[in-house]
Amino acid sequence: ITAKNSVDNIGANIKANEDLIISAKDISNLSTLRINGHDLDRISTGENLASIEAKNISLDAKNDFQNSGASIKADEDLTITAKNVNIDTIEENRYFHSGDSKNYLTIDNKSNISSNIEGNNININAKNDVDIKGSNIVAKGEANIKADGDVNIVSATDSEYLAHKESRKKKFGRSRSEETINYRTSNVASNVIGDKVNITSGKDVNILGSNVVAQDSGNISAKGNITEAATKDINYSYHQKTKKGFGGLTGKSVTEELHQEINAESNLYVKNKAVIDGDIKVLGSNLVLGDNSIINGKLTTDSNELHSSYSLEEKKKGFSSSIGSGGFSVGYGKSQSKLKEKDLTNAKSNLVLGDNVTLNKGAEITATNFTHGKVTVNNGDVKFGARKDTRDVE
């Protein structure tokens, strides 16, 4: 298939029993969403999932290659060549809203449909950047990713949001209300898996909330920096209950709020003979390099800071009475109590180095669980450090 401008496979299937070659200015393989409902009651779901299948596949775009929530499967070799390669997700959504500021229900849920790229040997080449988000690159043999610019292997995010408020009015100015908000996110990792994995960048390699697994050997090379870092999932809740008495002169309200950050680590695993060519930084994640591995740049590991908070506030107002030697007395007052907690937790990295591992520029290992065999340090020092968890209570 050859086109002067673009070849767009939108929600369709392209299949060849033998070889498939597509050449164009731009190439896209896009799944589609079905949208039902209207602005305040809307559901979008994956409907037509695009796919490309053949024994051998060659996709050659002079400009951009885009694969969104779609699959490409080669029985043998798969090659993707473009100026920019973007492999990402499509997002399903359930949105509903009903009511006003006093009585309402809101639902807003989002989930990702990943792209899946499969083959015996997979080769991805970009003159600029390779961006992989919330998707899977799985090779039975070799997975080779090369960019003159950045290689970004990052996660997508699923989320759930539910908010509900109910208010009731009674006689004589009395009322009750209750409001609840819950929100949480879930990391959707990208996965690059192969018997052998080779990643080469003319600039930086970024692995964020994702996994790179070489079941035999692997090579990661960057002229800039290599970063393997965790992302954060969020868990948030808010609950407020309010009661007002006669004429609004008496009342009580209780407000509780919770915010949690949860570590969503990356994993970089090479069974044996790993070559890390460039400075590498690992944050709140796992780095496992087997026997006979080499790190030619400086190795830095550290924790990922997780912040959590909790607050509980109670307010009261009303009348009080007492009987004493001076007679009967009536008073009116307000009271307030607060509890606030803030936590900083360091999610440690895990570093595992096998036997006969060489560090050619030393290492700084902080807040990290370190397991190792025989390690040789040719240049630089190995420094160890710690982080301190903290808690503030008011």
What residues fall within each predicted segment?
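Binding/recognition "hotspot" determinant
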Residues: 1-394
